[in-house]
Structures are given as C-alpha cells and as structure tokens.
C-alpha cells in the first residue's frame, strides 16, 4: 500500500515511527511512502533519510521519489540517483504531469535503469477548481464538480505516450468505470501498465456528500455507485493490480473546517483490510493478481 506520513516537515500529521507502528499493527509487512513531504523527497539524501528512519521497524518502508524537482512539474528530479539509493518508483503525489514531453522523456529515461513512473490521473484544465465528483450530488449541494472526463483524458494521454515510448507506467488511484476499461484495453495491447484503486473508492460513493463531512473529501473524489461496482469488478478480474489505503492523515486544523476549505486526504491503514474484505473476497483478489 502507498501512504503519506508527515515526516519530514509535517510531523504534526504523523511521524515515520508512528506511521510504521500503525502499519505493523494493521497487518502490513511493507509500505511505499509518498514523496509529499517538506522538503520533497527528490534526491538521494532524502531517500536515504527515509530508509534510515525505518531500519528497525517491523514493517519495511519503500520510498517513492518525486518525479520532478520539488514536485513542481518542471524539471526532472535525480531519478537514477534515487533509484540507486532505494527508491522503488517516481511520482509527484496527487499532482498530474501536465507537460506531455516531460512524461515522454521520463518514460524513455527510466528504461535505462528499470524505473517505474507514476502518473496521477487528472487533467487539471478540465478539473478546474472542482472538489467533488461532477454529477447530481454536486449540483444539488452547490459544490464545484470534477468531471470523470478529467481522469479519462489524462489516462488516455498517458497510454498514448506509453505506447510510443515503451517503459513501465503506473496509474495510481483510478476511480471510474471508464478508467478500468481504458487500462483493460491497454493491457490487451501488451503495454507495461499497472494501476491501483484506493480502498475507500470500493465502498464509498458521492452519496456520502450531503452531510458535508470533510472526511469524505479525497482526491480523486468519491464517484458513483456504478463506478464503485466497476472498480470492484476491475479488482476481481485482475485489471486493477493493487488496492491501496492511500493513507494520508491531515491535521485537524486543516480537516475539521468548512468542506470547501478542507484539505484532501483520509486515514486508511487501520481500517483497510476489514473494509476491503467487506466488499471483496480477498482470496479471489489474490488469485486474480
């Protein structure tokens, strides 16, 4: 599972030590940690810091290095050096790669050292200032919506680039029915593509929104019941490779506020197995992958 701890920079959210303890108690033998810290994990020293902080932990920690310097989406980070220091993949956590050529070059370059590139499935120009799924509920509640199209366009672009460049690409936390279909077709073509789904997208929908509970403000947003059913089918059929907790604790000052002002993110390590097991036969999932 991929997680976001606060250290370094946001220790008030969660330290590495506490996060690893929670992961171990929740049954995880290994986790991948995102680069969304301060400073961002975009160099070998930062990768080594994370590994050194976890040497005696029961749960193994695998760092995901930032794809770009400072996760700003402009200049590529030190991918090779981070890989040599222990980074298992490269991603600007929950930030789309807007520059098409940047992703193209990253996919080409990473092939030199068997690197794995993540591309977050969101087209910002389509998503705009949306904060929830665009649909009946967003209209009824007067909340700005994010069209599912924002996810589909980004994934389609990524797949075209991957077909051109070769290499390995991972699409994290897909959230729609059409995304499952797009990746299914790409796998049929033989592209080296994997994807994940956040556990909460398997059992929560945008029907939770009328209470304006900021715990349900996540990125990608909660979608429809039809999407949830398709995601579950994607898991059991093997199209979706990973179920992730997308554990991202937010401090109370930034979460217990007006819905539109709250930061995206929710905790997920403690509840993940029980929640997933309530909607998916885990034996069936293991056999599928």
Say what each PLM segment does.
Residues 166-168, 209-244:
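A conserved active-site cap/scaffold subdomain adjacent to cofactor or substrate pockets
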Residues 28-30, 88, 241:
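Short acidic/polar active-site loop segments enriched in Thr and Asp
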């Amino acid at each position: 599972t991929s997680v976001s701890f606060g250290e370094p920079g946001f220790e008030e959210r969660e330290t590495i030590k506490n996060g690893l303890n929670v992961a171990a108690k929740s049954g995880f033998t290994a986790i991948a940690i995102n680069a969304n810290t301060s400073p961002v994990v975009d160099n070998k020293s930062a990768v080594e810091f994370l590994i050194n902080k976890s040497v005696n932990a029961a749960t193994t920690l695998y760092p995901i290095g930032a794809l770009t310097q400072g996760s700003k989406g402009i200049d590529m980070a030190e991918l090779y050096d981070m890989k040599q220091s222990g980074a298992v993949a490269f991603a600007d956590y929950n930030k789309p790669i807007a520059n098409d050529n940047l992703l193209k070059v990253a996919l080409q370059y990473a092939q030199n050292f068997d690197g794995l590139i993540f591309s977050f499935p969101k087209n910002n120009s389509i998503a705009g200032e949306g904060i929830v799924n665009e649909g009946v509920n967003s209209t009824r509640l007067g909340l700005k919506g994010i069209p599912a199209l924002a996810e589909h366009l980004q994934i389609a672009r990524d797949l075209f680039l991957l077909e051109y460049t070769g290499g390995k690409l991972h699409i994290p936390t897909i959230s729609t029915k059409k995304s499952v279909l797009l990746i299914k077709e790409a796998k049929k073509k033989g592209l080296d593509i994997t994807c994940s789904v956040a556990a909460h997208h398997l059992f929560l929908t945008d029907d939770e929104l009328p209470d304006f509970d900021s715990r349900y403000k996540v990125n990608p947003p909660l979608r429809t019941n039809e999407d949830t059913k398709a995601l579950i089918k994607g898991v059991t059929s093997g199209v979706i490779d990973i179920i992730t907790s997308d554990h991202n604790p937010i401090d109370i000052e930034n979460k217990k506020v007006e819905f539109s002002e709250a930061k995206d993110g929710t905790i997920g390590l403690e509840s993940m197995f029980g929640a997933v097991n309530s909607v998916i036969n885990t034996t069936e999932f293991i056999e599928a992958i």
